[in-house]
Amino acid sequence: MKKIKEAEQRKLRRKKRIKDKIGRGVASRPRITVFKSNRYFYAQVIDDSKGHTIASISTIEKSLNLGKNIDDVKKLGEVLAKRLKEKNINNLIFDRNGYKYHGLIASFATSLREFGINI
């Protein structure tokens, strides 16, 4: 039990360190944050000055019919990039939310970059 609490505390410290470095998202450059559960992958674009979610996407959406593997997360990045282009948002601050920049997180960010979003 002690190891679990220590791991959780390390993750919270990592999240705080990352947030302190990247700053807050504003309307001209909102923050995109990601979350991984055991079954799904979520991402949302947040304007921290207003406290509003501008856009969100996840593999749980029935219309997308995606799973939680690297290829599906790349498709998720493509769909989100198209949604952001419709709203004229091209610049984002990427918040990896304490996760390592590896695997799903890295492929999602790369997919956004490939479709014209500056991170």
UniProtKB/Swiss-Prot annotation:
Q: Where is this region: Disordered?
A: 1-20
Q: Name one GO cellular component term.
A: cytosolic large ribosomal subunit
GO-annotated molecular function: 5S rRNA binding; structural constituent of ribosome
Q: Does the keyword Nucleotidyltransferase apply?
A: no
- Origin superkingdom: Bacteria
Q: What keyword terms does UniProt attach to this protein? A: Ribonucleoprotein, Ribosomal protein, RNA-binding, rRNA-binding
Keyword presence, Ribosomal protein = yes
**Description of how the protein assembles with itself and partners:** Part of the 50S ribosomal subunit; part of the 5S rRNA/L5/L18/L25 subcomplex. Contacts the 5S and 23S rRNAs.
Write down the NCBIfam families for this protein, in alphabetical order: L18_bact
- Member of which family? Belongs to the universal ribosomal protein uL18 family.
User: PANTHER family from the xrefs?
Assistant: 39S RIBOSOMAL PROTEIN L18, MITOCHONDRIAL, LARGE RIBOSOMAL SUBUNIT PROTEIN UL18M
**Reported function:** This is one of the proteins that bind and probably mediate the attachment of the 5S RNA into the large ribosomal subunit, where it forms part of the central protuberance.
Q: Which HAMAP family does this one have?
A: Ribosomal_uL18_B
Identify this protein by name.
Large ribosomal subunit protein uL18
Gene that encodes the chain: rplR
